[in-house]
Design a protein with these regions (language model features):
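Low-complexity, acidic Ser/Thr/Pro/Gly-rich terminal tails and inter-domain linkers that flank the onset
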Residues: 22-41
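Asparagine-centered strand-capping/turn motif at beta-strand->loop junctions
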Residues: 48-56, 471-473
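Feature activates predominantly on carbohydrate-active enzymes
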Residues: 255-502, 687
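Acidic, contiguous N-terminal accessory segments
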Residues: 22-23, 125-268, 272-300, 556-564, ...
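Short acidic, flexible loop segments centered on an aromatic residue
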Residues: 37, 54-87, 128-130
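Flexible, acidic glycine-rich loops studded with aromatic residues
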Residues: 554-771
Length: 835
């Protein structure tokens, strides 16, 4: 009976196509979710596919291809004559249509199926559709849309309502500007008594500090109307004074009635003083007021204040990375971890190995991946530009390193090995096949990364079965050494030392190498490797020798220091015998309830220098609630801006309000390890991350970058929050809410309007407002007080010309009210409906 239903749907589609107007405007692929069957973790969905090409799609010759992080078709529910294939990864899917599925141009095919898995967000659903026509050997990329709001069972998703958000924002209220910070991250000490001076043109001197005068002049001038000069023929009204009592990055900034003074011991401190001054002057101009007469004494809490940008999953070019560096410098971050490779992309040009970027730098339709990688994360057929394609040239990388150095930022190259290496493996396999075809086996095997005879079986965290390098062949180490040395050469061209090299090494699945003939021989002939379980540690020591030989220090994710076992991401045991490697772990996997919340403290207490990269606090792609329209992931929980801001790096258990919300009691906390006072020096700092699986446009990238980067900078630089010293959740909550309200106001009223004017601007997040109607009165709130809220009563989506919400207003109970947040430029966010 069920199959008859689906066959009838197919028959119906043919009847529908006869009525379809050839000129009707339509989105080629409509994916309609008919039912969310939450109890059974299934969905009933309907595909509507329109041939929008000028060529007939003859049955038996065409197939539909797409990616979807969640959702796998239940084969038994497919219409007869339709074949489903899961290819690999997370996820590349294909439907091949049999002989009776003939679609002329503008014809439409409609059929229904069931899927395993509930799509938690649109960004994790189907995307990147294209049709491959095997007869014409062409691909047609198809625009798509997901329709879901009228699905049965939608109430089971617990989607946040306008009223829910209104409650979430209940502790937020608009503050007067004299209660707001002039500088973020908040300086260690500041004295402002409410007095102002008149603005004036600036003429500064650097008094011998090794900073490029034109660079400071240009940077300080950005966004300002006053003139900035450094002219010895004029009187100086901004003086820089050397103060050797200050630490390297510390500074004093004093704005007086007639002059400005900066004190520092090193150029880094001078630079950060100018960044603080820049913020103050920009805010003063935006608010059309004088300059505050203020004294600031400032120094960072942590030496390492990092941001990692993933350009491997989805690629963003040099120009975007330079803009990121500008914003990092503004907020006093000093380490840029550039993730250049992963399973889904190789993004750095390497001389002598063109396959890395020709194959590994592109995704799209392929029969054997000798020309490019399979589509992933909505990259489409590859015949059009997409964020799945692209790479940095060597010169691009040199310019990035130089640009960063000028802004007191160190660039750290991240080249994943031996895990998350699928792009490199496939590229070198293409090289192998090409040279083998012409009989040059020496060249074919020189940089080989796979064992063709390996029968090992595994699935990585992203569901790949072939993303781990065969580390039992000299060719693998020859390859990695070449990469290290070629990247070192780029640093030399940038006149900058390569101090650190990141091997990644996260999420190594259990199972590789166990059935590899190469590895069996390698272990049998090497007394330093007793068993296959010892192979990975031996590999790490070889990598360390290569990296230290290049004058750098080896760093990577903490996974490399944990026992490689069937426990995989649940493993807790530390490999203390690797302490002599001087390896710095970036400790990321601390999901609440996962058992590794205290891992960084355990590592530091054992003597490892470590950096906190907490997924439950500092991953910008973690969404904040169940909203279907959010971009990002939630595997490490739902993380709000307030959660990130409220994280105490030296003791993640100190925020009692957060523990209470998570249901974590004191007995559970008592089982965890805390950072010992004598190990505090091993805690080097913190790093934020932006992974790009769901980031398919610059707009999405910007919305996840900002204001996350600003919030993170507060934790990286500013002092510990005073409310954390209070003993209980009950005591902490009012103080926490008050402090967050002050910070959120500083974001909404000052920082977000300011960054709109800097470095080309950024489309920062505009959170959905919250609202209720109580006794015919509309009440609205927003996450960042100071941003505008506009509304309509006629059912139309609000624009920048719509009425501005300023106070509660009377509304008709029968009206459908649309509400939307706006920034200072008039750009609007997503709208909500209040009934």
């Amino acid at each position: 009976m069920r199959m008859k239903k689906y066959l009838w749907a197919v028959l119906a589609c043919y009847l529908l196509t006869q009525c379809q107007s050839p000129n009707s405007e339509t989105i080629p692929v409509i994916f309609t979710i008919d039912t969310f069957d939450v109890p059974n973790n299934q969905m009933e969905v309907t595909f509507s596919i329109t041939n929008n090409s000028n060529t007939p799609w003859e049955g038996g010759t065409w197939s539909l291809h797409w990616n979807s992080i969640f959702g796998e078709i239940i084969i038994e529910t497919l219409p007869e004559g339709v074949e489903y294939t899961y290819v690999d990864g997370q996820q590349y899917l294909i439907l091949a249509f049999g002989e009776k599925y003939n679609l002329k141009p503008n014809d439409k095919l409609i059929f229904s199926v069931k899927q395993k898995g509930i799509i938690p967000r649109l960004a994790m659903g189907p995307m990147g559709f294209f049709v491959h026509n095997d007869k014409t050997k062409t691909n047609t990329d198809l625009e798509s849309k997901i329709i879901w709001k009228n699905a049965k069972g939608i109430e089971g998703l617990n989607l946040p309502s306008a009223a829910d958000r209104y409650t979430t924002y209940e502790t937020l209220e608009l503050l007067s500007k004299d209660q707001l910070d002039w500088v973020i991250p908040t300086p260690e000490k500041q004295n402002f008594n409410g007095e102002y001076r008149l603005p004036s043109a600036l003429n500064f001197e650097l008094n011998g500090f090794k900073i490029d005068t034109n660079f400071i002049k240009t940077r300080l001038q950005e966004g300002l109307t006053i003139k900035v000069n450094s002219d010895e023929k004029l009187d100086y009204n901004l003086s820089v004074i050397k103060n050797n009592s200050l630490s390297e990055e510390a500074y004093k900034l004093i704005i007086l009635e007639d002059k400005i003074k900066i004190e520092a011991s090193e150029s880094a401190g001078i630079f950060y003083a100018f960044e603080s001054l820049h913020q103050i002057l920009l805010i003063a101009e935006n608010e059309e007021k004088g300059w505050p007469i203020i004294t600031i004494e400032d120094t960072p809490r942590f030496k390492n204040r990092g941001f990692m940008s993933d350009v491997a999953r989805n690629f963003y070019p040099k120009e975007k990375l330079l803009q990121i560096l500008d914003y990092m410098a503004l907020y006093k971050l000093n380490r840029f971890d550039l993730k250049l490779t992963d399973d889904d992309g190789w993004r750095i040009e390497i001389p002598g190995l063109p396959e890395l970027t020709q194959v590994g730098g592109n995704r799209g339709y392929t029969q054997d991946e000798n020309d490019r990688l399979i589509p992933m994360y909505g990259s489409g057929s590859g015949d059009q530009d997409s964020s799945g394609n692209g790479f940095l040239t060597g010169q691009d990388f040199v310019e990035i390193v130089q640009y960063a150095k000028e802004r007191n930022i160190e660039v750290i190259p991240q080249i994943s090995f031996p895990s998350h290496a699928r792009a490199a493996i496939k590229a070198m396999k293409a090289r192998y096949d090409n040279f083998k075809a012409i009989g040059n086996m020496e060249a074919a095997t020189k940089y080989m990364l796979h064992d063709p005879e390996d029968q090992s079986q595994y699935r990585s965290a992203q569901l790949y079965s072939d993303n781990v390098v065969c580390i039992c062949d000299a060719s693998a180490y020859r390859f990695y050494k070449k990469i290290i040395l070629e990247i070192k050469t780029l640093y030399e061209k940038a006149d900058t030392p390569m101090k650190v090299f990141n091997i990644g090494a996260d999420e190594l699945p259990y199972g590789p190498w166990q059935k590899s003939p190469k590895c069996a021989d390698y272990i049998a002939n090497n007394k330093a490797i007793p068993t296959v379980n010892d192979l990975y540690n031996y590999n790490l020591r070889l990598l360390n020798t290569m990296i230290t030989g290049a004058g750098a220090r080896m760093v990577g994710w903490e996974d490399a220091l944990l026992v490689h076992s069937e426990n995989e991401q649940s493993e807790l045991n530390i490999k203390e015998d690797l302490l002599d490697l001087d390896f710095i772990p970036y400790v990321w996997n601390n999901s609440w309830g996962g058992g590794r919340e205290d891992m960084i403290y355990r590592l530091a207490n054992k003597g490892f220098k470590a950096i906190m990269s907490n997924s439950s606090a500092f991953y910008f792609d973690m969404v904040d609630d169940y909203d279907m329209e959010n971009s990002g992931m939630s595997w490490s929980g739902y993380v709000t801006y307030k959660d990130s801001w409220g994280t105490e790096p030296l003791n993640v258990f100190a925020n009692k309000v957060k523990l209470q919300a998570l249901g974590i009691d004191e007995a559970t906390v008592a089982t965890k390890e805390f950072l010992k006072p004598e190990a505090k020096g091993n805690f080097l700092g913190i790093q934020s991350q932006l992974w790009t699986e769901t980031i398919t446009s610059e707009e999405i990238f910007d919305g996840l970058l900002m204001p996350n980067l600003i919030v993170f900078s507060q934790r990286a630089w500013a002092a510990k929050e005073p409310w954390l010293e209070l003993p209980s959740a009950k005591d902490q909550k009012p103080a926490l809410d008050k402090a967050w309200n002050q910070f959120a106001n500083s974001l909404g009223q000052r920082q977000l309007p300011m960054i709109n004017k800097l470095f080309g601007g950024v489309e920062h997040d505009l959170p959905k407002p919250g609202g209720i109607i109580d006794q015919d009165t509309l009440y609205l709130r927003q996450q960042f007080p100071g941003l505008e809220i506009r509304y309509t009563l006629d059912g139309i989506k609000p624009s920048k010309e719509s009425p501005l919400y300023e106070k509660p207003l009377k509304v008709s109970i029968n009206k459908t009210i649309h509400v939307r947040g706006f920034d200072a430029t008039g750009r609007g966010g997503k709208s909500i409906i209040i009934n």
